[in-house]
Swiss-Prot record:
The keyword Protein biosynthesis applies. Its main location: cytoplasm. The gene is glyS. Its EC number is 6.1.1.14. It comes from Shewanella pealeana (strain ATCC 700345 / ANG-SQ1). This is Glycine--tRNA ligase beta subunit. It holds the Pfam family DALR_1. It is found in: Cytoplasm. Tetramer of two alpha and two beta subunits. Keywords: Aminoacyl-tRNA synthetase, ATP-binding, Cytoplasm, Ligase, Nucleotide-binding, Protein biosynthesis. HAMAP family: Gly_tRNA_synth_beta.
Length: 689
């Protein structure tokens, strides 16, 4: 079989930078899926992407499908011929449909009978005749939320398309994509190199585009150049570039021919909190800030231009001119904001509604303050500082800086709190109240920060559930799932002695008559239980382990964690499988019992040796188990219970639980109930698979 390399490039207008990688990856994934469906073999496949192009390269693609033999079974021989041995209409119709006569058919014998059979040889289709349709289907499945039309064309795509290049080796693949006929034309850089050129062979795509078109189509290579050159540029001025990957990806998606340059700004701007300057440089201008080795912001930034200039200083001066007014705005906001303290801004919070039924932001911070103080008493934190931090937690929302740069909420609160003479613990708590902000973000660890972060999230959760606006489906406008996971993570990662039932009840009490949902406490608790499951599944914990713990509904996150670890460990023990099965059997037996069982086991009614042995073993373990369960040492407790495996197995082998004698039966049920009760102190082991 012959093979050749395939190139497909879609030349467009500037593509959305934040979507570029995803579009290219999806295009490749969709197309390779099409190849697999078409039974076309290939060695490897890669994607390339630049601001004005999406491309995929398939290496060593088979030039045709392999020929194959398809077995087509006909009617059973008994129905294929009549009593005289002549073909029936069914047999002749089947044969005609397969282009043969009945006499030419083979026979297939199986244990269920004998059938007519035709082994049809199917000749593989040439690859080049399939490519265009496969490519179009691949493009149709791209994740494009808002496709657009252009000109008089009815075709839709994420951006207008100007060229389509499909080359199988040196041959142009005939066909049309997105209303554009395939050709070998490749467009180069807008301002450098050849504006367009003809590509002679798919193998030469990257090299020709680089040398003729001045475009680096290899996304990863372009990203690596930017990273390496930016690091070198920062080192040259004695600093370290802040090359956050999201911004690095975005910049990579904005340029075809990256040139890294270094610029500066006036040192006076360094009096403004660094976060505000960094936000301006990264968010608005797509610049990389530079820090010294001590983590202090330097009056420099690194940027990437899309052109090689004979006078780079002119480009540097232009970028410095652009960023200066933005930094000056930040300086003005900061100086203006300093004129009022955070406490003085509390009054203005009365004018801002948090949620119509839940009152103003001022009422919200009063609740957060009380809640934070309440939590502080449970974790040995300073309740006055916690309450103070809660009260000031939203004051920075009324500052010019946060109104202009909303992502700086909390951060600017910290800076203003320090300027106002608040304690460092209070200041840091204002900054950390929204943590964790995203998956993988760190959680607060300082006591006052913990109190405020929990209070802030609980106020939102209980409030929104309390007015009947719980998340439905994928919609979660108040980010309640993130808030709930945040509460759980803060409690778990700090091993806090807090119970969700108490926290929910306190938050409900503080909301008072605002809440109209009578079931708010139970609904919020159930919401937390669902988040427990989601969180632990993300951590790789087996679902059956999670369900075993959830069955007991432990409401203290730290306690939930201890049980999860204990059950996960128990599951690895040799005895686990047998004891899980025994617990399931016991559970099923007890579920069918009507009426109450004896409160205690009557030793006089223990007749069989196996039931005596189990009762003795259980009685021997109970004094050891009680303190372990009291101390939430579930792992050691379950390890002790694992020693019951032999006694339990023997019991079920030798003892008839549902004896005819009512007293014996009830005593045995009481024994099994006592056994199950010990396991249930930790989890429902019967749910383990």
């Amino acid at each position: 079989m012959n093979f050749e390399n395939l190139l497909i490039e879609i030349g467009t207008e500037e593509l959305p930078p934040k979507s570029l990688r995803k579009l290219a990856e999806s295009f490749l994934a969709n197309f390779t899926e099409e190849l697999t469906k078409a039974e076309l073999s290939f060695e490897s496949a890669v994607w390339h992407a630049a601001p004005r192009r999406l491309a995929i390269c398939i290496n060593q693609l088979a030039l045709a499908q392999a020929d194959k033999v398809v077995e087509k079974r006909g009617p059973a021989v008994a129905q294929a011929f009549d009593a005289d041995g002549n073909p029936t209409k069914a047999a002749m119709g089947w044969a005609r449909g397969n282009g043969i006569t009945v006499e030419q058919a083979e026979r297939l014998k199986t244990d269920k009978g004998e059938w007519l059979l035709h082994q049809a040889r199917v000749v593989g289709v040439e690859t080049k005749s399939l490519i265009a349709d496969m490519a179009q289907r691949s493009l149709d499945k791209l994740p494009i939320p808002k496709p657009m039309r252009w000109g008089s064309n009815t075709t839709q795509f994420i951006r207008p398309v100007h060229t389509v290049t499909m080359l199988l080796g040196s041959e142009v693949v005939d066909g049309e994509l997105l209303g554009i006929k395939s050709d070998r034309i490749i467009r180069g850089h807008r301002f450098m190199g050849e504006s367009s050129f003809k590509l002679d062979h798919a193998d030469n795509y990257l090299v020709a585009l680089k040398e003729k078109g001045k475009v680096l189509a290899d996304y990863e290579a372009r990203k690596a150049i930017i990273k390496t050159d930016a690091e070198a540029a920062a080192a040259k001025i004695g600093g370290v570039a802040d090359l956050e990957d999201d911004l690095l990806e975005e910049v990579t998606s904005l340029v075809e021919w990256p040139v890294v340059l270094t610029a500066s700004f006036e040192e006076k701007f360094l009096d403004v909190p660094a976060e505000a300057l960094v936000y301006t440089m990264k968010g608005d201008q797509k610049y990389f800030p530079v820090f010294d080795n001590a983590g202090q912001l330097l009056p420099n930034f690194i940027f990437v231009t899309n052109i090689e200039s004979k006078d780079p200083q002119q480009i540097i001066a232009g970028n410095e001119k652009v960023v200066r007014p933005r930094l000056a705005d930040a300086e003005f906001f900061f100086e203006t904001d300093k004129k009022d303290t955070l406490e003085a801004r509390l009054t203005s919070l009365e004018t801002v509604v948090f949620q119509k039924q839940l009152g103003t932001i001022k009422q919200r911070v009063e609740r957060i303050s009380a809640m934070a103080g309440y939590i502080a008493t449970s974790i040995d934190a300073n309740s006055e500082e916690a309450a103070r931090a809660g009260l000031l937690s939203k004051s920075d929302l009324m500052t010019n800086m946060v109104m202009e740069f909303t992502d700086l909420q909390g951060t600017m609160g910290m800076h203003y709190a320090r300027l106002n003479g608040e304690t460092e613990a209070v200041a840091v708590a204002l900054s950390e109240q929204y943590k964790p902000k995203f998956s993988g973000d760190t959680v607060p660890t300082a006591p006052i920060s913990i109190c405020v972060a929990l209070a802030e999230k609980l106020d939102t959760l209980v409030g929104i559930f309390g007015i009947g606006q719980a998340p439905k489906g994928a919609a979660d406008p108040f980010a309640l799932r993130r808030a709930a996971i945040g509460v759980l993570r803060i409690c778990l990662e700090n091993n806090l002695p807090l119970d969700l039932v108490d926290l929910i009840a306190k938050a409900q009490e503080l909301h008072g008559e605002n809440l109209t949902n009578a079931d708010v406490a139970e609904q919020v608790l159930e919401f937390f239980m669902a988040r427990f499951r989601a969180w632990y599944q993300d951590q790789g914990v087996s679902v059956d382990v999670i369900l075993a713990v959830l069955a007991r509904r432990p409401t203290a996150p730290a306690d939930f964690e201890s049980r999860i670890k204990a059950v996960a460990h128990f599951r690895t023990l040799e005895q686990a499988s047998a004891l899980a099965a025994a617990n399931k059997r016991v559970s099923n037996i007890l579920a069918k019992v009507e009426g109450e069982l004896p409160a205690a086991i009557d030793d006089k009614l223990l007749v069989e040796a196996a039931e005596k042995a189990l009762a003795e073993k259980l009685a021997e373990l109970q004094p050891q188990l009680a303190p372990l369960f009291a101390a939430a040492n579930y792992q050691e407790a379950l390890a002790l219970l694992a020693s019951l495996r032999e006694s339990v197995d023997t019991f079920f082998e030798d003892v008839m639980v549902m004896a005819d004698d009512e007293a014996l039966k009830n005593n045995r049920l009481a024994l099994l109930s006592s056994l199950r009760e010990q396991f249930l102190h930790a989890a429902d082991i019967s749910l383990l698979q």
